[in-house]
Every structure is written in C-alpha cells, then in structure tokens.
Amino acid sequence: MRLILWLPVLVVVLLMVLEGPAPAQGAPAIASTFSNIPNSLKEFGNNLKDAFESIPEATRKLMTSFAEGLKNLRLPLL
C-alpha cells in the first residue's frame, strides 16, 4: 500500500531531478554597467554632501532644545 502512495511522489521528484538546473537569468551588458558607474558615484557624492551640510543645523537645533530644557528645569534648593 505504501509503495502505491509513494510511487507518484517518486516519479515527480525524479522528473524534477532529471530536468536539470534552471536557466540563468540574462546578465546586463557589461558596457552599460561601466557607463552607469560615474552617474552612481556622482549621485552618492551629492547625497553625502547634503548629509554633511545638514549636520551643523541639526546640531544647533539639538543644542538649542537641550539648553531650553535646562532653562525650564527647576531644581529644589537643598
């Protein structure tokens, strides 16, 4: 009885194994990859520049909010 149940499963597995590996996906042309590198580097540089330019303003806001918090803090006298 078990042989009858396992026979279709064995046939399907055998067919999958004999089919072989799936075909590889086509790789993009290497020339187009090399031509996109300068644009990618320029975009990365612009993003990095924008990030570094925003650091002083963010630090200023953080320090201002910290100073305001200290001004509003009321400590009881001991």
UniProtKB/Swiss-Prot annotation:
Main location, first listed in the record: secreted
Listed under GO biological process in this entry are: lipid transport; lipoprotein metabolic process; negative regulation of cholesterol transport; negative regulation of lipid catabolic process; negative regulation of very-low-density lipoprotein particle clearance; triglyceride metabolic process; very-low-density lipoprotein particle clearance
Show the InterPro entries listed in the entry.
ApoC-I (IPR006781)
The question of whether Signal is a record keyword is answered with: yes
Query: Where found?
Result: Secreted
Q: Which family does it belong to?
A: Belongs to the apolipoprotein C1 family.
Name the record gives this protein: Apolipoprotein C-I
